[in-house]
Amino acid sequence: MQSMLPGAPWLLAHKSMLSTNQPRNFSLQGNDYVMWMNAAGEVHALPNTCPHMGAMLSEGWCETAADGTSQVVCPFHALAFDAQGCTVLPGTHKKTLPQMSPLDLIIQGDFIWSYGRHAPAMSIPTILNDVAQHYHLIGHTADISIATDLLTMLLNMHDYNHQNGTHRDLFRITEVQFQQFVDQGYESHAYYDLPTASYRWHEKLRQPDLFLLPKTIHAHLENHFPSLVIFHGEVPMGKVAQCHLFIPEADHRTRTYVLLFGQSKHPAFHLLGSTFLNFSQVVVEQDAEILSQLYPDSPQKIKLNNEVGLDWVKRNFASFPEVVEPNFSKGDRTQPAKMTA
């Protein structure tokens, strides 16, 4: 269980990812749950196993009451369970005691957090509330499960040398020019530039999205251990905050998805939303592919430069839930700026 960091908060979903009164299954730290949202926007979660004969509740449907609340209905024998896990047995017309223990959810605006079945060992980061206040939601993408453990997933996301290998086919990155790493314990910021090889004109004409790729990618990654990495990017028409989320589904299976937010400087920026989402999806798919090609537990005999992000993840993972004195800051850039409108 320690490999899934019990006591850490996990962002299970954004409300935009849920359809009203449509059950959805998800896994967290070795347990399966069903989640649903009623017409009032209230979100509930129960164990996904029907206590009668074990059917998957997420394969059922929702029934709505006159007051707008809803229940999830088992697809096997049509037993309906309310948000507390109670049901009414046929012929009794009386609600039972709870047959399941609801999963505690912490709703912050449209963000649905949970500590699973564990007592909180760290606070929920507030940065996404700031992002939602100053940016508009473009959408979500790349919601997939990858057959890898949480630590390996996090090491990949904080490996500042992997872009010119893993993401070569899209960005054609030629080198990593690392500038600064700011270690603030469970929060960190990384700044680096990624020069890219140019696409030819006929390649761009065949794929117009490529016109958006800059000659040099100026990367600012804002990291909130263990569940969130935000790529802050800017184009002439606006800014983007590409939020990568991570959730340990089981010891060797990790879910990831992207929430994309934008801040427009030009009306045309709103037309580019699907393009930015497509780029995000390709990035996640490339990461998933390389993670499927690793030999697990192979010893690292070579150490590259700019591996400070890996060291940061390993330190926090090993010491969790204790906070270790920050000791990995390097570089001479100014401190990270606060979120502004």
Protein language model features and the residues they cover:
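C-terminal catalytic domain of Rieske-type non-heme iron oxygenases
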Residues: 124-341
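Hydrophobic, proline/glycine-rich low-complexity stretches
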Residues: 1-8
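Rieske [2Fe-2S] iron-sulfur-binding domain
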Residues: 11-130, 341
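Ordered hydrophobic segments in well-structured contexts
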Residues: 9-13, 34, 44, 111-113, ...
